Amino acid sequence: VLSVCRAGDEIIVPRNVHKSVINALILCGATPVYLNTETDSKLGIVLGVTVKQVEQAIIAHPKAVAVLVNNPTYYGICSDIKGICDIAHSYGLKVLADEAHGTHLYFGDNLPINSMKAGADIAAISMHKSGGSLTQSSILLTNNGINADYVQTIINITQTTSASYLLMTSLDISRRNLALRGRQSFAKVTEWAQYAREEINSIGGYYAYGRELINGGSVYDYDVTKLCVYTRDIGLDGIEVYDILRD
C-alpha cells in the first residue's frame, strides 16, 4: 500500500480488508473507498466483490490510484481478480492483492487463478500459512508495473535492519520445496479436502460448503482447500464446536 499510495490519494478496498491495510493507510495518509461486500445469509460469511462494483467505484472516485483485492478470503471466497485487474488497468489504476491465504494457488491446476497470473501489480503472500515457512515470514511479489527499487525503499523504512535469518532461511527452504514438490503436494491436499467435504456432508446436520457457492459474481471461484463446516443446523455455533473439540 505504501508503495503506490501517497497522502490525499484514494484506494478502493473491500470492507473485509485485513487491519494491516488500514494501518498502512494511516501511515501513508491515503483514504479508503470501501466496497460493501455481500454476506451469505445462511453461512454468515463475507463474500467477494464484483467487477461492476469496482468499476462503479473507480468512476465515482477519480482520485483513486489503486484497487485492493482479497484472493482468496479466509473462507476461500474468490472474486474475479482477472476481470478486476483488466478494468482497473484500463482506468490506469494499480491492483494490489492480499494473497495471505493463497500461497498454494501458484501450485494447483484445479485451484483459482493466482493474482500474478491474473495481472495484479503487487501481491503480499503469507508463506507461513500454506507454504510451510515459519510464522511471520512472507514474500512480496511484483509485476513490471511496480518500481521495485521504490518498494525496497519502503521496506527499508518500515522494517528492521536486523532481519531474522531463521525466518529468511525458512522462506528459502519452503520456496525450494514448493518449486520441487508443490504441485504434487497440493494435488493431494485438494483431493483430501474434497474427500473430507463429501464425508462430512454425508453425516447429516453438517454442511461443508464448496464450489456450489459459485455464482459468477460475489463468489466468482472457490478455493476447495479451505474446509469450513457449518454447524448451526445441529444447534452449535463455531465457538461451541471449538470448545467441544478442545475438550
Residue map of PLM features:
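Conserved PLP-anchoring active-site segment centered on the Schiff-base-forming lysine
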Residues: 5-21
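General beta-strand structural signal in soluble alpha/beta enzymes
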Residues: 13-14, 34-35, 68-69, 95-99, ...
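Active-site PLP attachment segment
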Residues: 112-153, 159-170
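Structural signature of PLP-dependent enzymes
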Residues: 174-197
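A short helix->loop->beta-strand "cap" motif at the edges of active sites that frequently abuts
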Residues: 9, 90-93, 120
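Active-site phosphate-binding strand-loop segment of PLP-dependent enzymes
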Residues: 43-104
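Conserved C-terminal alpha-helix-loop-beta "cap" of PLP-dependent enzymes
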Residues: 191-247
